[in-house]
């Protein structure tokens, strides 16, 4: 099976340049599988040697995927050497989870009022205080909410140019994302006064956000969940949400619960929450919230399930949706 994106570097005429492709022995792999890489040489050009790498780390042409390998589409590169010149070609090798996710259902234990106009993007508890980020340009806000009554205790409205997205609380600060504006905001948690901002790097959009007490986890609408330094907000690495069959895209709102990332998926065919291993991206579980949407008032503009807030004291999840 050929998985190929060609990127060549040469000094001569590109039409006459050697054309190489990376060939893998399988379409997909799981941990423990053996990867065999070789070069397909379209022009049958003689070459001196070839060097392979996965995620920038050099490997032998025969490589066994370790148990703790990062899942998803692995950037793979070959450097072909011909008479002192280098020719590069890249592709992705897909590594899937070795086991299927566990399936869970839910028990509804209570209902609370919620602003029907709130286009909820982020939701997180600190004790009994519920913090919420809402979206849509001209309607985006940061809120502190009394979850029992639904009353908004304090609200900071964003400038109309911004589309609010996920939020998280860490070290006395609130960090809030925007969607396509390439900027995140940092607030003092108690006063909710804005203190500073930061710009995105490789992740061009802001979707969901959570933290484990040390680092931040940020989704960007793809399958990727980025790890960010909590102090500088710089991107460090990423994982990809991956099952035993596929890579799941449109990862949205995030919540950190007992060592795992719980995630909504935007515009999914089903109202589900994924349970993701933050170490390698494995989707270890899926919570099916089927039927939950029918239990709320069927207002005009009722949108998708979004917003997960875990209450550690009650050991329950508070979930809502956009509008």
Question: What are these language model-derived features?
Answer:
Residues 132-137, 176-181, 218-222, 263-268, ...:
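Conserved beta-strand positions in repeat-built beta-propeller and related beta-rich domains
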Residues 8-10:
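C-terminal motif of bacterial Sec signal peptides marking the signal peptidase cleavage site
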Residues 150-187, 192-203:
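Blade-loop segments of beta-propeller domains
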Residues 107-113, 151-157, 193-199, 237-246, ...:
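A short beta-strand motif characteristic of beta-propeller blades
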Residues 116-127, 160-171, 201-213, 246-259, ...:
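Beta-rich, blade/repeat-based domains predominating
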Residues 96-117, 147-153:
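A short helix->beta-strand "capping" segment at the edge of beta-propeller domains
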Residues 145-150, 188-192, 230-233, 277-281:
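Short loop/turn segments that connect beta-strands within beta-propeller blades
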Residues 65-73:
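Surface-exposed, short loops/turns at beta-strand junctions within beta-sandwich domains
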């Amino acid at each position: 099976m050929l998985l190929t994106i060609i990127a060549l570097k040469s000094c001569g005429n590109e039409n006459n340049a050697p054309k190489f492709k990376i060939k893998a022995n399988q379409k997909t792999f799981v941990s423990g599988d053996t990867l065999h890489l070789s070069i397909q040489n379209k022009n049958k050009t003689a070459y001196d040697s070839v060097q392979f790498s996965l995620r920038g780390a050099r490997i032998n042409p025969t490589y066994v995927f370790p148990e703790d390998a990062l899942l998803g589409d692995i950037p793979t590169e070959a450097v072909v050497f011909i008479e002192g010149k280098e020719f590069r070609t890249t592709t992705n090798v897909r590594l899937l989870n070795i086991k299927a996710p566990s399936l869970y259902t839910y028990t509804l234990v209570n209902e609370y009022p919620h602003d029907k106009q709130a286009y909820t993007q982020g939701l997180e508890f600190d004790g009994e205080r519920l913090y919420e980020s809402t979206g849509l340009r001209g309607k985006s806000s940061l809120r502190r909410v009394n979850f029992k009554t639904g009353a908004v205790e304090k609200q900071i409205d964003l400038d109309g140019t911004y589309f609010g997205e996920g939020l998280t609380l860490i070290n006395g600060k609130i960090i809030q994302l925007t969607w396509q504006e390439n900027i995140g905001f940092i607030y003092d948690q108690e006063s909710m006064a804005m203190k500073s901002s930061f710009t995105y790097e490789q992740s061009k959009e802001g979707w969901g956000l959570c933290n484990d007490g040390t680092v931040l986890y940020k989704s960007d609408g793809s399958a990727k969940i980025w790890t960010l330094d909590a102090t500088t907000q710089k991107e460090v690495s990423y994982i990809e949400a991956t099952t035993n069959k596929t890579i799941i895209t449109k990862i949205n709102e995030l919540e950190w619960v007992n060592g795992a990332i719980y995630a909504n998926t935007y515009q999914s065919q089903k109202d589900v929450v994924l349970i993701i291993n933050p170490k390698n991206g494995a989707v270890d579980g899926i919570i099916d919230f089927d039927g939950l949407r029918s239990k709320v008032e069927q207002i005009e503009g009722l949108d998708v399930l979004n917003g997960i807030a875990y209450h550690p004291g009650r050991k329950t999840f508070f979930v809502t949706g956009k509008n």
